[in-house]
A protein has these predicted regions:
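Short hydrophobic beta-strand motif reused across regulatory alpha/beta modules
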Residues: 320, 426-434, 489-497
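Alpha-helical transmembrane segments and immediately membrane-proximal extracytoplasmic
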Residues: 1-377, 381-382, 387, 392-398, ...
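The conserved cystathionine-beta-synthase
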Residues: 391-412, 419, 436-441, 455-482, ...
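Generic long, charged, amphipathic alpha-helical segments
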Residues: 281-308, 434-454, 458-461, 465
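Flexible loop/coil segments at beta-strand boundaries within sensory signal-transduction domains
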Residues: 421-424, 483-487
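Intrinsically disordered or compositionally simple regulatory linkers and C-terminal tails
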Residues: 364, 507-530
Length: 530
């Protein structure tokens, strides 16, 4: 009955406090960054940790890290709003707070920075990474002053893992990646079933808590955060049937509870499920082929990280997190291989991750691949240096209108640079300016242009040109040199910006298609969201 009571309180808090406390926190933070300019209501800084504490304290099968990450992000966002910062600055503060929350929970500053980069920042820039890194380092230092520098999860030092055994751990990672797809889809399938219930959603957590209580009665280890379970799995204390039961029941309990919309984290349950599954697979492999040298404890470590990599798509954060929290010196190669395999399987079989599926179902698109800005890599001189049709500054509108009506060569352009008698650029005029009925035929062109002219330099990037066009609300820019800023050498238009993408798209199209998720493996609920 205790989990049910806690779930009722959480449902009540969500109904009358804020519905944003539902879920595990990271998707909600991502959504605020992407679509709400990183503005998180101040009340969430209290409601989220309190609701999570009630949920976990009454037996909910969740980790505390998700709500802590969400709370840290909310604090950063609120601070940014108090200081009247820009949306970009609030995003950095939110990510710094979230990363600091993770670093303080596990003592894993590097993986916290990587998690912020892979899931929250949506960019890789010094202005973003440095504040996040400093926040994570500070949070870890504070943690060490209270609990010491011991790793979050105790694990004996294992022997060297090399040769053919690495292939075994890669295979384990692939199988755990397949399981991560099943876990993710199951959670959202259960959520879909709750949405069909003819009762208000504030009562759903109580229904989910019934399953939590029943399962917890028969297997108490499924209740609560379960960090002790992770310790026992990694140290090899749990084995055989116990591992299988814990893996299955923890998954059922957690997925039902999370699907019901209560408050709690996903990381610890994923680590428990993945670690137990990895240990079972490694033990099975060792029994079938003893010569491989598979170690169930290393299999547990790989499985723990691979489950997180497959479910969240945070590949580098998963690898480094497992290393930082266990300080297993010879675990990097198995971790990198296993997590990469899990990431690949998840990417091929599932369009969205456990972090982004909820956002996608609300009709929003979440970026999943990041690359250097192509426009930043192309200079204006590469596309904008060409002969330009110019107009003399002393021409009258009457002569220009007659020339354009004649459809003479060059007269069909939408904009024209205006050149003074000495050959210097004084501005740009458009067809709309020339044919404006409010301007008489006797007007001369010099009177129509703005001074000084808005120009772009030949050594600027196309990104600079695009930004300038947006800021000035114009569709073309004269190109000049820095040495001679009034001498026209070309022009660049919006069409040039679009055409600059053509080589990149042609080169990448075939490769990107090969990595697209397969519609065959997508469930109807996921298909309807895209």
């Amino acid at each position: 009955l205790v989990p049910i009571g806690g779930a009722i309180i959480v449902g009540w808090m969500a109904r009358f406090g804020s519905a944003a406390i539902r879920g595990h926190g990271i998707p909600e933070a991502m959504e605020q960054i992407l679509f709400n300019k990183s503005r998180i209501p101040a009340r969430l800084t209290l409601l989220k940790p309190i609701s999570a504490a009630i949920s976990i304290g009454t037996g909910g099968p969740f980790g505390a890290e998700g709500p802590i990450i969400a709370t840290g992000g909310a604090l950063g966002s609120v601070l940014g709003q108090m200081l009247e910062t820009t949306a970009e600055e609030r995003k950095i503060l939110l990510s710094a707070g979230a990363g600091a929350g993770m670093a303080a929970t596990f003592g894993s500053p590097v993986s916290a920075v990587l998690l912020a980069i892979e899931l929250l920042l949506f960019e890789y820039r010094a202005r973003s990474i440095i504040p996040v890194a400093l926040a994570c380092a500070t949070a870890t230092a504070v943690r060490m002053s209270f609990v010491g520098s011991a790793p979050a999860f105790a694990m004996p030092v294992l022997g060297e893992q090399s040769g053919i055994v690495l292939a075994g751990y890669i295979a384990i990672g692939a199988l755990v990646g397949l399981a991560s797809v099943f876990v993710t889809r199951s959670v959202y399938w259960i959520e879909d079933q709750f949405e069909k219930l003819p009762i208000h959603w504030m009562w759903w957590p109580a229904i989910g808590a019934v399953a939590v209580g029943v399962i917890g009665y028969f297997e108490p280890r499924t209740m609560g955060v379960g960090y002790d379970n992770i310790d026992h799995i990694l140290s090899g204390t749990l084995a055989g049937r116990t591992l299988i039961v814990l893996c299955a029941l923890k998954f059922i309990s957690w997925s039902i509870a999370l699907g019901s919309g209560t408050s709690g984290g996903t990381l610890a349950p994923l680590f428990t499920i993945g670690g137990a599954l990895g240990a079972v697979l490694a033990a099975g492999g060792a029994a079938i082929a003893p010569s491989l040298g598979l170690d169930p404890r290393m299999g547990a470590l790989v499985g723990m990280a691979a489950m997180f990599a497959g479910a969240s798509r945070a590949l580098l954060a998963s690898v480094v997190f497992a290393f930082e929290t266990t300080r297993q010196p010879l675990g990097l190669l198995p971790l990198l291989g296993g997590c990469s395999a899990a990431f690949l399987v998840s990417r091929l079989l599932m369009r969205h991750s456990i972090m982004t599926e909820k956002i996608a179902r609300r009709g929003s698109r979440v970026p999943s691949d990041y690359g250097a800005d192509h426009l930043e890599q192309v200079l204006v001189r590469d596309v904008g240096l060409r002969p330009v049709v110019t107009l003399a500054a002393d021409r009258t509108l009457a002569s220009l209108r007659a020339w354009m009506h004649s459809h003479a060569p060059g007269s069909t352009h939408q904009g024209f640079p205006v050149i003074a008698a000495g050959g210097s650029l004084i501005g740009v005029v458009t067809r709309r300016d020339i044919f404006d009925p409010a301007r008489g035929d006797e007007r001369i062109l010099r009177e129509l242009v703005a001074h000084p002219p808005i120009v772009i330099h030949e050594d600027d990037s196309l990104r600079d040109a695009a930004d300038l066009m947006v800021l000035e609300k114009i569709g073309r820019l004269p190109v000049v040199t820095r040495a001679a800023p009034h001498r026209l050498i070309g022009i660049i238009t919006r069409s040039d910006l679009l055409e600059a993408h053509a080589p990149r798209l042609e080169d990448a199209h075939e490769a990107e298609q090969s990595l697209e998720p397969r519609d065959l493996y997508r469930w109807p609920a996921a298909r309807s969201s895209t």
